[in-house]
Amino acid sequence: MNVSSMIERLVHDIYCLTPKKLVLCCFLAVVAYCFLCRKYAGRRWLRPCLGGLLALWLSAVLWITVFSRSTGNTEAHWLPLSTYWRILSGESRELLRSAFMNAVLFFPAGLLLGGLLPGHRSFRWQLVCAVICFGLISLGIELTQFFNRLGNAEFDDVLHNTLGAAAGLAAFHVKWSD
């Protein structure tokens, strides 16, 4: 079994989790992350480790969304919130799961970014940084998928990914509040 098939299997297994199990796994990961950040706060090696984890996360996301896909048909849905209109019109409820999974995919990025950004900056400043940074990354992924015919390109994916990153950043700040 090569690395590519192992990654595909892992992604498939994660995607097939029920939403309750996925939320539970995310919650446990956040608790573990918060515990480690609090325990090792102020250590010199913590930020480089978080930066490395963020780079690893970005590599995994690019692998999942761009490099592991083969070319084929592509559709573009650039109308904001079109996913919800399509669900209400009777299309597959799988679209709702896909929206949720897009948010979950970017949640770790916001969590990691919270540990990397300077602590003396306000939450609002950090939130703007996260929205711009991960919004542009997500837009880049969607445009790459569209122009290389690697799947559907949707504005809603950019929205859900960005909301997931913002939720991760908010989770980081909730843990540090007194």
Give the predicted meaning of each segment.
Residues M1-L150, F155, A166-D178:
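Bulky hydrophobic segments
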